[in-house]
Amino acid sequence: MQLRSRQTQMLFVRDRDIEIHYQATGQGTPFLFFSETACPGDIWNHFQVPEFSRDYTVITHDYRGTGKSSRPTAQYSCDDFVDDAAALLDHLNAGPAIAVGHSMGGRVAMLMALKYPAKVKKLIVASVGPGAPSAPPIPFKMCKEMAEWGYEKYVQEHTLEVGWTREYIQQHPDKVEHFLNIRLNNLPRLEDYLRHVVARQACDLSARIREIQHPTLVLVGEHDHGSATGASHRVAAEALAKELPNGKFAVVPNEAHNYFMTNPDEAHRIIRNFLVSSS
């Protein structure tokens, strides 16, 4: 079902204990965005909301534990994130939606397609793999660096390591600083960040990827080789695309992990071409 309101921002009461903050902008088929690990939904406001709200109803939301949403003290799971999003679509009387997820959000979007297939029309999963059964609850590399540097410096250094190529950092220091400030100013509490990491690590879809029948675009940056675990996002994304029955693989040239911010025009062009070709 298509939505008609131009923009709505409010809290949706998921149940007695959970409120999910969301924003719906535009008109048309729902375009549901899932952010990366422990990142609130307003990260999409810079480029993706203005671009896609011209043709769609863009729905962004803050995961539980981030932004203006509730911060329950129990451990989170990707199932929780999916159930929150599915309930939000029900609340808005919207769907099926084009589900878009970046990094951890891509895995959440795939889980939504598996758990609520009728609520998903198409999938766009960016810079992510299916997970692994042997993934530790918190990656050793993260534990070591966070212990040495502290929470905020870890997030800053990790974002610098995976987010941009060295050339981009040298050529655009002002843009890098701007994005880092956005990320650091919206950090959740440490305990909520770690709950997100544990949820991501526990989300192993590797045995179920072939069950996803939706048209799916797997997107990744050409130089997206870093991750919190030390593995390569690009290698994981390429392997994922080969497993999907209706998967299509695309690369954003010359970019690392943060191409939605550094080269949104190319990312949007690839996405729009996919949406047309998979109609």
What annotation goes with each model-predicted range?
Residues I212, V218-V220:
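Short beta-strand/loop motif that positions the catalytic acidic residue
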Residues T60-V100:
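Active-site loop/oxyanion-hole signature of alpha/beta-hydrolase fold enzymes
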Residues M110, L114, K121-G150:
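Flexible "cap/lid" loop of the alpha/beta hydrolase fold
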Residues H223-A231:
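Acidic catalytic loop of the alpha/beta-hydrolase fold
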Residues S134-P136, Y154-R208:
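Conserved alpha/beta-hydrolase catalytic His-Asp/Glu region
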Residues R16-K68:
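Conserved HGGG/HGGXW glycine-rich cap/lid loop of the alpha/beta-hydrolase fold
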Residues G101, G105, A109:
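Gly/Ala-rich beta-loop-alpha elbow adjacent to hydrolase catalytic centers
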